[in-house]
Regions:
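Flexible "arm" and connector segments at domain edges
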Residues: 1-78
Length: 78
């Protein structure tokens, strides 16, 4: 991985981490304030996480990840 690729990877990882924290925060707000509707905020953050997760996934083994997803879906009956 050259310097530019590494810089892009770090940027994407940082953005993913930021969006994961924002999603976790929105979900905790919904749990802690059940009379307030945070569904739109949660949906927005899920979308943001998906975008950056797709960007980061390209640096990892897609076959391995897909296999793990299948196993987890079976394990938790999802």
């Amino acid at each position: 991985m050259n310097y530019q690729d590494f810089h892009n990877f770090r940027f994407k990882c940082n953005k993913l981490t930021e969006e994961l924290v924002e999603l976790a925060t929105a979900m905790l707000q919904q749990r802690n304030k059940p009379k307030t509707d945070f569904h739109r905020e949660i949906e927005d953050e899920i979308a943001d996480v998906e975008v950056w997760l797709m960007a980061v996934k390209q640096y990892y083994n897609e076959e391995y990840i897909n296999n793990r997803v299948s196993i987890k879906k079976q394990t938790y009956d999802l």
